[in-house]
């Protein structure tokens, strides 16, 4: 063989067709004859190892802790008692946080409590407590808890980082407050015991959901290479911004940044990516393992420094510190 030429022979099918991109290789021999070979490149556009969507993680953890109909019924006799004490619990919680030096420093209240900030915090906490006492297990609540976790990672309006130890500790404080109010109300021990078991399970699932969001948000900040990601069209409404910086290590594949991006923005994942399941047979077993991978939906494009990655190396292309990604929905 005298020469090997890599040529792009990917064609865009109509929307109704199933897309199967290929790379075409033209091999010229010494005799001048040409042989053509094609190789599917679908795998070059795959994004694997994505975290579960927040709704999936929420339902998984509720099942794990056993928060089902019987557990809900155990909590119900205490709801009225806790609701009557709700405002008092909100006020006492932030009084406590303001007087503990570590949490006062986190909130920026070392010298004095900011009344506007305090009002914001109490409002959020009141809404959370109301939904908790309503035993809300909806997907909407799952997303709100996930978002609260990202706010703890300094992604909220005030950019305050709340270390996860204090989030975990706060859940313990609330369980203690619940138990205290039930005891003050002189509820029977036969009610308090099962109810505290139920509230512990429910708040543990909530804690996991917030830490889930926190850890994915912190992952966006890890790495020396700061990659600017620009969004266009309807994608901007889904992520509520026109661009964001995602950190990774220099030389990482584009796939790594996209994985962080679509972990962090679950609504964008549902819109831009198509989930596919793959079966992996086990040796000497009747069982098979199912794994999921994601591909861009038809018409979605990811550009690295202006070059469409469907035609330029796929998501395995390596990133440098000054690189930029642009993501376009269909029609752009």
Per-region residue spans from a language model:
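Heme-based O2/NO sensor domains and their adjacent alpha-helical segments
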Residues: 58-63, 83-183
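Short, Lys/Arg-enriched N-terminal segments with co-localized hydrophobic residues
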Residues: 18, 22-36
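Charged, compositionally biased N-terminal leader segments and the immediate start
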Residues: 25, 36-73
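Phosphate/oxyanion-binding loops and surfaces in catalytic or ligand/nucleic-acid-binding neighborhoods
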Residues: 131-135, 205, 209, 213, ...
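Short terminal or interdomain "cap/linker" segment that borders an active site or interface and mediates
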Residues: 38-41, 50, 55-60, 184-224
